């Protein structure tokens, strides 16, 4: 279990629309909020995500 910016499979962030709390909870986390991730912009930060849910890997660009 860890905290982090939840990632799409291409190492792209989920933007904060409509909100992050539901997205994080639907993926097994305890909740979430909007944050700013340098190089990605406004993104969803999740608390206590399971290890099998991807989080943003620093230094790897979004390749969508």
Curated annotation (Swiss-Prot):
What keywords are assigned to this protein?
A: Amidation, Disulfide bond, Ion channel impairing toxin, Neurotoxin, Secreted, Toxin, Voltage-gated sodium channel impairing toxin
What processes does the entry annotate via GO biological process terms?
defense response
Enumerate the spans annotated as LCN-type CS-alpha/beta domain. 2-63
Cellular component terms per the entry's GO annotation: extracellular region
Q: Which SMART domains match?
A: Knot1 (SM00505)
Q: Give the GO molecular function terms.
A: sodium channel inhibitor activity; toxin activity
Q: Which Pfam families match?
A: Toxin_3
Q: InterPro entries, per this entry?
A: LCN-type_CS_alpha_beta_dom, Scorpion_toxin-like, Scorpion_toxin-like_sf, Scorpion_toxinL/defensin
Localisation per UniProt entry: Secreted
Q: What SUPFAM superfamilies is this protein classified in?
A: Scorpion toxin-like (SSF57095)
Q: In which tissues does this protein get expressed?
A: Expressed by the venom gland.
Residues where Lysine amide is found: 64
Name the family the entry cites: Belongs to the long (4 C-C) scorpion toxin superfamily. Sodium channel inhibitor family. Alpha subfamily.
Question: What exactly does this protein do?
Answer: Alpha toxins bind voltage-independently at site-3 of sodium channels (Nav) and inhibit the inactivation of the activated channels, thereby blocking neuronal transmission. This toxin is highly toxic to insects and mice, and inhibits the binding of alpha-toxin to cockroach neuronal membranes.
- What domain comment accompanies this record? Has the structural arrangement of an alpha-helix connected to antiparallel beta-sheets by disulfide bonds (CS-alpha/beta).
Q: What is this protein called?
A: Alpha-like toxin Lqh6
User: What is the protein's species of origin?
Assistant: Leiurus hebraeus
